[in-house]
Amino acid sequence: MVSSQPKYDLIREVGRGSYGVVYEALVRRTSQRVAVKKIRCQAPENVELALREFWALSSIQSQHPNVIHMEECVLQKDGMVQRMLHGSSSVLYLPLVETSLKGEIAFDPRSIYCLWFVMDFCDGGDMNEYILTRRPSRRTNTSFMLQLSSALAFLHKNQIIHRDLKPDNILVCKSRDGVDEPTLKVADFGLSKVCSSSGLNPEEPANVNKSFLSTACGTDFYMAPEVWEGHYTAKADIFALGVILWAMLERITITDTHTKKRLLGGYVQRGAQVVPVGEALLENPKLELLIPVKKKSMNRRMKQLLHQMLSANPQERPDAFQLELKLIQIAFRDYTWET
């Protein structure tokens, strides 16, 4: 980072997205490996995505092993560097908030604004790469299902709706001994929403399953039918996770039209056309999904749970806490996937 006494040494670039670059870095004082994401704030949409991620991760008062942890956020303007805190009245921070709210740059465009997020470093790529480069493993599937349901329950408990759950946004940290299953971390909170309390008791935490959102966002193959309509709650995250788990268990893949990369994702086939599950259910809520596609890919309880998670009616889906409990029961009470 740009400072008279840098805290981090950037080692190499490990990823590049639409609004930022991610580096592997070392903490100078401890030699700890971290990931540093640099976001250039030259466009209002970049600022909004960055601030959404910052607000979501900084709102969490505790850590969870399966949710990416943000160590700190540093704001850089030209030669000035300042640690950014949520709710700050800093003259550097407020123009970014104004930019996000108005949708237009609220600072001198000649200034170079950057945000630096310091987060956990994950050395195993993303879930998509990990699953598709290895043979199917019941042990891995079970571990990943439990980790992801635990992460989602934690986020919803903290009033955060992710809104873009997909394998590309789930990072993998390899186990140190190479024997245990890797640790997953839900990441990329640029589209997330922190639900605030309202009504008669503002001190009471918001119920994410009753907080309705209207901005249709996410990635089409993981979007719930109600998201396409623009009227949804946290149950949309349950649907997205249902698509992910279904695709993981049966190795169902789609092809990214831009990169030609194979991705884990469920779909409905219409002749030669591949249609996102949510879009198909929006058009026909009574559509019966073919789960499982492969006869012995899952047991009866898992089949029933996936049908519930992928229901066209959000009220018929379990909430994140019910889902976590159901998956624990499936993992530890069922000894075979064929019953």
Curated annotation (Swiss-Prot):
Transmembrane intervals: none
GO MF annotations, alphabetized: ATP binding; protein kinase activity; protein serine kinase activity; protein serine/threonine kinase activity
An example Gene Ontology CC term for this record: nucleus
SUPFAM superfamilies recorded: Protein kinase-like (PK-like) (SSF56112)
Subcellular location: Nucleus
Gene3D superfamilies (UniProt xref): Phosphorylase Kinase, domain 1, Transferase(Phosphotransferase) domain 1
Main location (coarse class): nucleus
CDD domains tied to this protein: STKc_PDIK1L
Active site (record annotation): 164
Keyword Membrane among record annotations: no
EC top class named in words: transferase
Residues that bind ATP: 14-22, 37
Domain Protein kinase, first and last residues per copy: 8-332
EC number, as in UniProt: 2.7.11.1
Keywords assigned: ATP-binding, Kinase, Nucleotide-binding, Nucleus, Serine/threonine-protein kinase, Transferase
One of the GO BP terms on file: negative regulation of G2/MI transition of meiotic cell cycle
Catalytic activity: L-seryl-[protein] + ATP = O-phospho-L-seryl-[protein] + ADP + H(+); L-threonyl-[protein] + ATP = O-phospho-L-threonyl-[protein] + ADP + H(+)
Stored InterPro entries: CC_SR_Kinase, Kinase-like_dom_sf, Prot_kinase_dom, Protein_kinase_ATP_BS, Ser/Thr_kinase_AS
One Pfam match: Pkinase
Similarity section: Belongs to the protein kinase superfamily. Ser/Thr protein kinase family.
Protein name as it appears in the record: Serine/threonine-protein kinase pdik1l-A
Source organism per UniProt: Xenopus laevis (African clawed frog)
